A protein has these predicted regions:
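A broad detector of short, well-ordered amphipathic alpha-helices
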Residues: 8, 12-15, 39, 50-53, ...
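Zn2+-dependent cytidine deaminase-like catalytic core
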Residues: 31-130, 215, 241, 246-248, ...
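A short, flexible N-terminal coil/short beta segment enriched in small residues
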Residues: 10-14, 29, 34-41, 130-143, ...
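Enzymes that bind and transform nitrogen-containing heteroaromatic metabolites
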Residues: 2-17, 22-24, 63, 80, ...
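Short, conserved alpha-helical segments within structured domains
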Residues: 25-27, 127-130, 295
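Proteins enriched for Cys/Gly/acidic motifs involved in redox and nucleic-acid/cofactor modification
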Residues: 19-21, 112, 126-154
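Short beta-strand scaffold segments in enzyme catalytic cores
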Residues: 26-35, 153-154, 358
Length: 375
């Protein structure tokens, strides 16, 4: 096997931790000696051993003189687990091949420095692009302390997310809906507006055995969420957060929600609407590193104007709804000129069942507003 193949194996291993390691990164490691893999591992779950230590634990023989391929710079600090650099040095591994650099201020080159000072050869940035693709959530969160937000919606080929009556089940096919369940497993949080809750009474959980459900976040300026909604009734089972902005006549409602297991966050702007940027800071402080935004057109518009959306994923179905009254993915007042559009960059287009998924990065540009419209 080649160096590239060993690192590809490490990447493959890292992906096994998808959805379980947040807010930690996904990491894989492969230990090679005399052209043979003698140990491999990955970070399985937040709070548990890191990839390098799991790889060392799986060794079939001494690692003295071996090479370890790891997708992310080894840690060098004591956190929930001991430093991986110490374990590498103790095992007398002679060479470390690293994919991604760790922007965590507690690491950020210090791990490499410690290894080199111990006489270990270090190769950096090997297949870095491929390794970086593993952890967009982690890289964003560790440097900003706010969640990486992906706006997701399903629409018809003529750009409708619902008919003129508001009906939307189902736009996409079963395969696309299964992929959305997988996406929910990947993210720490899922966010919707009160309009979606009142119209659809959704659970916003994961319905596939073996996958985890994200923290459910509802943007509800005036705290209109019904205590008998599915989200509130299941809050003891699935962590639920309701963000609100208007304190008028809400004291009793808040007590009821808290009794039922719902957490609340008060984050108003000067217009008594939810300040989305502040909400992201508050959610980040709770350890939420990523959010799947499954909002309607109003919340999507507000999120884009607030500048919190980093990526857009659109599932497009081969059907047409028509009608000027049909709901669209992004509402609000819109822009006056094409030059004012939110610019996107295609990153992937693929077919899932009968539907197409389009993934785009949001291009950085001047952000203007941080408040929600009335929700």
């Amino acid at each position: 096997m080649t160096d590239q193949e060993y690192m590809l194996r490490a990447i493959q291993l890292a992906k096994k931790g998808e959805g379980w390691t947040n807010p930690n990164p996904m990491v894989g490691a492969v230990i090679v000696k005399d052209g043979r893999i003698i140990g491999e591992g990955y970070h399985k779950k937040y709070g548990e051993l890191h990839a390098e230590r799991n790889a060392i634990a799986s060794l079939t023989e001494s690692a003295e003189g071996a090479v370890i391929y790891v997708t992310l710079e080894p840690c060098c600090h004591h956190g929930k687990t001991p430093p991986c650099t110490e374990a590498i040095i103790e095992q007398k591994i002679r060479k470390v091949v690293i994919g991604s650099r760790d922007p965590n201020p507690k690491v950020a080159g210090k791990g490499v420095q410690m290894l080199r000072e111990a006489g270990v050869t270090v190769v950096e940035d090997f297949m870095r692009e491929e390794c970086d693709q593993l952890n967009p959530f982690f890289f964003h969160y560790i440097t900003t302390k706010t969640p990486y937000v992906v706006m997701k919606y399903a629409m018809t080929l003529d750009g409708k997310i619902a008919t003129k009556t508001g009906a939307s089940k189902w736009i996409t096919g079963e395969a696309a809906r299964k992929e959305v369940q997988h996406m929910r497993h990947q993210y720490m949080g899922i966010m919707a507006g009160i309009g979606t809750v009142l119209a659809d009474d959704p659970m916003l959980n994961v319905r596939v055995e073996g996958w985890k459900s994200p923290v459910r976040i509802v943007c509800d300026s005036k705290l209109r969420i019904p205590p008998d909604s599915q989200i509130v009734k299941s809050a003891e089972k699935y962590r639920t957060i309701v963000a609100y902005a208007d304190q008028k006549n809400t004291e009793e409602k808040i007590k009821i929600l808290h009794t039922m297991g719902v957490e609340t966050i008060y984050c108003p702007d000067e217009k008594n609407q939810i300040d989305l940027k502040k909400l992201m800071t508050d959610l980040g402080s709770k350890g939420i590193d990523s959010i799947l935004l499954e909002g309607g057109g109003t919340l999507n518009d507000s999120a884009l104007r607030a500048g919190i959306v980093k990526e857009v994923q659109a599932f497009v179905a081969p059907k047409l709804f028509g009608g000027v009254a049909g709901k669209t993915p992004v509402e609000g007042i819109g822009v006056e000129f094409p030059s004012e559009a939110v610019e996107l960059k295609y990153t992937d287009i693929c077919q899932i069942g009968e539907d197409i998924r389009i993934r785009c990065q949001v291009c950085e540009k001047k952000q203007e507003e941080s408040c929600l419209q009335e929700l």
